[in-house]
């Protein structure tokens, strides 16, 4: 009976962790064909922000410069204008196809993320009892750990999130989220987020130690500072 009670929170925890991934996988399979047909048949007006438009223009200019350079370094100095235009036309079509696939990918991932968020919100609203049981199970599990293990876990987590090497991990994670939601890569915004998030988390963590841990478990705070020093 005790094993069954312990298995239920574990099952709920596993479902919460893997449910978004399963939803995203199923939605990708079912929506990909529909979104591709919708995008290609409706001939939707291209929606670009200033950053994306600037990036596309820069790629077109680079493409033209590469073809001109290719003609200049050929054995014969005469440039075949018709062949040059044909090459530009083929590369332009290929570039448009790549951009079209990128737009479809953006819409697909945005749709799956939105559906996953709605389903998880509904799960958190209608499954309050399961979440309460899961919360009690997590608190009991943490309570049974020794103060040394708790302090070591807190130190490991903080070093991963706000440590010396954490900006590279934040850059990868924020860049992945940016790409997943279809936002254009903008170095200044990405650098601002990477430099801001660890500082905010560090402030929240120090405030949490000061307000909560000092009151609940002073010995844990002492061990944490001893390990940290």
Swiss-Prot record:
Belongs to the CemA family. The chain crosses the membrane at residues 6-26, 107-127, 189-209. It is found in: Plastid, Chloroplast inner membrane. One of its GO terms (biological process) is potassium ion transport. The gene is cemA. The keyword Protease does not apply. GO terms for molecular function: antiporter activity; proton transmembrane transporter activity. Its main location: plastid. Keywords: Antiport, Chloroplast, Hydrogen ion transport, Ion transport, Membrane, Plastid, Plastid inner membrane, Potassium, Potassium transport, Transmembrane, Transmembrane helix, Transport. The lineage of its organism: Eukaryota, Viridiplantae, Streptophyta, Embryophyta, Tracheophyta. It is a multi-pass membrane protein. It catalyses: K(+)(in) + H(+)(out) = K(+)(out) + H(+)(in). This is Potassium/proton antiporter CemA. It comes from Lepidium virginicum. Pfam families: CemA.
């Amino acid at each position: 009976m005790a094993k069954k009670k312990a298995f239920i929170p574990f099952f709920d925890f596993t479902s919460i962790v893997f449910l978004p991934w399963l939803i995203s996988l199923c939605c990708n399979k079912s929506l990909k064909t529909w979104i591709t047909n919708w995008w290609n048949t409706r001939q939707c007006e291209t929606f670009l922000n200033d950053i994306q438009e600037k990036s596309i223009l820069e790629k077109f200019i680079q493409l033209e410069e590469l073809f001109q350079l290719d003609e200049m370094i050929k054995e014969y100095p005469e440039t075949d204008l018709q062949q040059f235009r044909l090459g530009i036309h083929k590369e332009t079509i290929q570039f448009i196809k790549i951009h079209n696939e990128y737009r479809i990918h953006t819409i697909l991932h945005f749709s799956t993320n939105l559906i996953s968020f709605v389903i998880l919100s509904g799960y958190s609203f209608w499954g309050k009892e399961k979440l309460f049981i899961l919360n009690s199970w997590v608190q009991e599990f943490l309570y049974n750990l020794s103060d040394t293990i708790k302090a070591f876990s807190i130190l490991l987590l903080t070093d991963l999130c706000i440590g010396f090497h954490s900006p590279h991990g934040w850059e990868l994670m924020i860049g992945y989220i940016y790409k997943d939601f279809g936002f254009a890569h903008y170095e200044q915004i990405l650098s601002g987020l990477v430099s801001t998030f660890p500082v905010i988390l560090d402030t929240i963590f120090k405030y949490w130690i000061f307000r909560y841990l000092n009151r609940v478990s002073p010995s844990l705070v002492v061990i944490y500072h001893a390990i940290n020093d």
